[in-house]
Swiss-Prot record:
Organism this protein belongs to: Variovorax paradoxus (strain S110)
Reactions that this protein is recorded to catalyse: L-methionyl-[protein] + [thioredoxin]-disulfide + H2O = L-methionyl-(R)-S-oxide-[protein] + [thioredoxin]-dithiol
The protein's name: Peptide methionine sulfoxide reductase MsrB
Domain MsrB: 9-136
Names of required cofactors: Zn(2+)
High-level lineage: Bacteria, Pseudomonadati, Pseudomonadota, Betaproteobacteria, Burkholderiales
Stored Pfam families: SelR
Amino acid sequence: MTTPIEKTDAEWKALLAEKGAEPAAFEVTRHAATERPFTGKYEAHWDDGTYHCICCGAKLFESSTKFDAGCGWPSFSQEAVPGAIRNIVDRSHGMVRTENVCANCGAHLGHVFPDGPTETGLRYCMNSASLDFKKK
């Protein structure tokens, strides 16, 4: 997968450490790990602002599109900027899902499901470890 921003694992680790990212951020964003449900700092976070990629700072979601899906991960109904998120078919764990990655740096963000409660019908189910929040 080629993206505009390419770095080695060592460079990503250093960048995330410099940003003060939580310990799980490297494994989540660079190796598609998933944080445990109801443990992420943004799961029950309702401040007004924007959510960005922890790795490169790309704007991903507006807080106005966040909703409580009851799944244990921050959930959004649509991306903030069309094309900011790239979809990849994920066949891991014996199922087929749609993985979301940052279109700018390839960071694993989470998955999108067609069961959202809003007019988009989508539920972007994200890992808090892949996000950085900027308050309005």
